[in-house]
């Protein structure tokens, strides 16, 4: 009876303290009973995350941060370098192929113009330059030439076109180191003598050569290049009359053949790019004939 009373008293005491008997003897429990203080203390011994991990995943001993293998770092370094190199190579290849494609298209255009020009534009002519020397179609060979037809009494159009021609000559010479022969052929032989042309052209680029001739000579060369010619035949130098003519620049290759014409739709910059492209795409006649005999000649046709 006495033992039962003691058990009951102990249970009542523990129930009031809200502590299990097992908790008194288990250090990892939630609560620890302090008999001397009469209060409950919360334990700071928290369960570590590693205690819940499987044994095969627990870290044994001190944790060691091993350095990344040199081979791995090398391959990572090489990978991004190879990527950059591939991008640069792709960009360079695209730019090169684009430029080659443009040159090939320009070359085909020039070949088509030559085929047309050999029948319709150009041919033999005899004129006199502003130094009094003869000038024929043979003087067109060996260099690129630009022909322009005008007259010294032109009030506005011819000076504007000669200014544009001056710009092209200067840019090609200074930036591309390309020498081109600029020719100014007069459509007014009665008034444009060699001395008059020399004085008139002195206001423009010094490389421009003035050409003139007799009425029949000038009319003949205008006809060969399909230039509109309206100058009356029997006129006096002091007589006032109108001269009308076509407004084109004719680009001639070193073989003396027509390859392109530039009208007023070309400004200074676009005309310069057009001339530059034609010169860069130029292929000598011997090379064109050699290509035409190869099995891959269809590429250039």
Swiss-Prot record:
Sequence intervals crossing the membrane: 82-98
Amino-acid positions noted as binding Cu cation in the UniProt annotation, renumbered to this chain: 154, 158, 245
Matches recorded under InterPro entries: SCO1/SenC (IPR003782), Synth_of_cyt-c-oxidase_Sco1/2 (IPR017276), Thioredoxin-like_sf (IPR036249), Thioredoxin_domain (IPR013766)
GO terms, molecular function: copper chaperone activity; copper ion binding
Ranges for domain Thioredoxin: 101-284
GO process terms (BP): cell redox homeostasis; cellular response to oxidative stress; intracellular copper ion homeostasis; mitochondrial cytochrome c oxidase assembly
Pfam family, one: SCO1-SenC
SUPFAM superfamilies: Thioredoxin-like
GO cellular component: mitochondrial inner membrane; mitochondrial membrane; mitochondrion
Subcellular location: Mitochondrion inner membrane
Alphabetized UniProt keyword annotations: Chaperone, Copper, Membrane, Metal-binding, Mitochondrion, Mitochondrion inner membrane, Transit peptide, Transmembrane, Transmembrane helix
Similarity-based family: Belongs to the SCO1/2 family.
Further remarks about this protein from its record: Present with 1480 molecules/cell in log phase SD medium.
Function of the molecule: Acts as a copper chaperone, transporting copper to the Cu(A) site on the cytochrome c oxidase subunit II (COX2).
PANTHER family from the UniProt entry: AT19154P, ELECTRON TRANSPORT PROTIN SCO1/SENC FAMILY MEMBER
Protein name: Protein SCO2, mitochondrial
Species: Saccharomyces cerevisiae (strain ATCC 204508 / S288c) (Baker's yeast)
């Amino acid at each position: 009876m006495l033992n039962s009373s003691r058990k009951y008293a102990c249970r009542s005491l523990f129930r009031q303290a809200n502590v299990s008997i097992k908790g008194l003897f288990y250090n990892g429990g939630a609560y620890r009973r302090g008999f001397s203080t009469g209060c409950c203390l919360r334990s700071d011994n928290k369960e570590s995350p590693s205690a819940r991990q499987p044994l095969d995943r627990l870290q044994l001993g001190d944790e060691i941060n091993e350095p990344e293998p040199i081979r791995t770092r090398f391959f990572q370094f090489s990978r991004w370098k190879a990527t950059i190199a591939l991008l640069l190579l792709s960009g360079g290849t695209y730019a090169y192929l684009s430029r080659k494609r443009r040159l090939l298209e320009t070359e085909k255009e020039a070949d088509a113009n030559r085929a047309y020009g050999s029948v319709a534009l150009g041919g033999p002519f005899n004129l006199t330059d502003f130094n009094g020397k003869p000038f024929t179609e043979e003087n067109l060979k060996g260099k690129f030439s630009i022909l322009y037809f005008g007259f010294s009494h032109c009030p506005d159009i011819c000076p504007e076109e000669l200014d544009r021609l001056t710009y092209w000559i200067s840019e090609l010479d200074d930036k591309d180191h390309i020498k081109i022969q600029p020719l100014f052929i007069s459509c007014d032989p009665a008034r444009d003598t060699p001395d008059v042309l020399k004085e008139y052209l002195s206001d423009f680029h010094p490389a421009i050569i003035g050409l003139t001739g007799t009425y029949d000579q000038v009319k003949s060369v205008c006809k060969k290049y399909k230039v509109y010619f309206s100058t009356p035949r029997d006129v006096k130098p002091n007589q006032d009359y109108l001269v009308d003519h076509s407004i084109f620049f004719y680009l001639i290759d070193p073989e003396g053949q027509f390859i392109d014409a530039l009208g007023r739709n070309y400004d200074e910059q676009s005309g310069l790019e057009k001339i530059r492209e034609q010169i860069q795409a130029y292929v000598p006649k011997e090379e064109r004939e050699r290509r035409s005999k190869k099995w891959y000649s269809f590429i250039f046709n």
